[in-house]
């Protein structure tokens, strides 16, 4: 199993590469790519960690060498948020980066599963889909927006608020991956009761958690380490499913036939071909139903923006 990380010299990419080097199954290959010249050195640094995962690093303008034979491609390339920016401010730079990298994936590893971390995910995933369609290699089972960070934040915040073990907390998160499009289904957390005020406060905190980190880092970066962990969790789940492990479910932003929007995040059963089944997300509270319905105009506009970017 070969996993490629594109954007591997950045804050997310390095954290992700470290976790993959230590946690991928024995015999896996890990290839790192970034435009930054430091990337081969990152691979050398990680190669000194004693695990049965071989690692190579490539830099420059062409990611081809990193993509040859890849089964999974995780893309974190792009610029990060700074104070005062929201995810949509990233669009102007990151849209072109994703378009180019998706085009290379279509050319070099057309059957690979692609997980997109680069924000704004609501828009960058549709960009990748349109590029893959134009190349004639689009398989909607193999393209994912990685929204796992919203899930782990939800679980962390619920655990802290209620004083319960994280092992006992599972929070599905649906919709998209920015602001009001992030909808944690707190009504589905088993064995926990929330007041209406707690639900409103928690939901807002989860939706704005990225800004919390950007402001706390005071211009020194965005949520790189927690995002690296979230991307590793998703990537490792995907690898295990591709290798035949059954019953692996992750929330992820996919082209899954949702009644709400072309792309929508919800629980997905992963399998040997990527998406095995998009699962129903179950019953919502009135608060959640209203929040879902209220987000759809923004989410659909984000998707259209990506589609139109590729169409020119």
UniProtKB/Swiss-Prot annotation:
Protein name as catalogued: Malate dehydrogenase
Keyword entries, A-Z: NAD, Oxidoreductase, Tricarboxylic acid cycle
Domain of life, per lineage: Bacteria
Record PANTHER family: MALATE AND LACTATE DEHYDROGENASE, MALATE DEHYDROGENASE, MITOCHONDRIAL
Family, as annotated: Belongs to the LDH/MDH superfamily. MDH type 1 family.
Thermal dependence of function as given in the entry: Optimum temperature is 40 degrees Celsius.
Gene source species: Moritella sp. (strain 2D2)
Active site: 177 (proton acceptor)
Position of the signal peptide: none
GO molecular function annotations of the record: L-malate dehydrogenase (NAD+) activity
Gene3D superfamilies (alphabetical): Lactate dehydrogenase/glycoside hydrolase, family 4, C-terminal, NAD(P)-binding Rossmann-like Domain
Lineage: Bacteria, Pseudomonadati, Pseudomonadota, Gammaproteobacteria, Alteromonadales
Binding site for NAD(+): 7-13, 34, 94, 117-119, 227
Biological process (GO), any one: malate metabolic process
């Amino acid at each position: 199993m070969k996993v490629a990380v594109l954007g591997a010299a950045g804050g997310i990419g390095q954290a992700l590469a470290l976790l993959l080097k230590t946690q991928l199954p024995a015999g896996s290959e890990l290839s790192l790519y970034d435009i930054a010249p430091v990337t081969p050195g990152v691979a050398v640094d990680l190669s000194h960690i004693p695990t049965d995962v071989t690692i190579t690093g490539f830099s420059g303008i062409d990611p081809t060498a990193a993509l040859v034979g890849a089964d999974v491609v995780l893309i974190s390339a792009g610029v990060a948020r700074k104070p005062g920016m929201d995810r949509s401010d990233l669009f102007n730079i990151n849209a072109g980066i994703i378009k180019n990298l998706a085009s290379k994936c279509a050319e070099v590893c057309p059957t690979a599963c692609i997980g997109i971390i680069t924000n704004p995910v609501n828009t960058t995933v549709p960009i990748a889909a349109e590029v893959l369609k134009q190349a004639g290699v689009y398989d909607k089972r193999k393209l994912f927006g990685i929204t796992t960070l919203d899930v782990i934040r939800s679980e962390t915040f619920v655990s802290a608020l209620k004083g319960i073990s994280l092992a006992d907390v599972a929070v599905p998160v649906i919709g998209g991956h920015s602001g009001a499009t992030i909808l944690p289904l707190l009504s589905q957390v088993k064995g926990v009761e929330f007041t209406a005020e707690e639900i409103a406060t928690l939901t807002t905190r989860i939706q704005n958690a990225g800004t919390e980190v950007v402001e706390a880092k005071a211009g020194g970066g965005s949520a790189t380490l927690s995002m690296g962990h979230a991307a590793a969790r998703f990537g490792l789940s995907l690898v295990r499913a591709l290798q035949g492990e059954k019953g692996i479910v992750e929330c992820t932003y996919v082209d899954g036939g949702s009644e709400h929007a072309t792309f929508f995040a919800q629980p997905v059963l992963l399998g040997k071909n990527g998406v095995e089944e998009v699962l129903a997300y179950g019953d919502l509270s009135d608060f959640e139903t209203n929040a879902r319905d209220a987000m759809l105009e923004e989410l659909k506009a984000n998707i259209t923006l990506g589609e139109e970017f590729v169409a020119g």
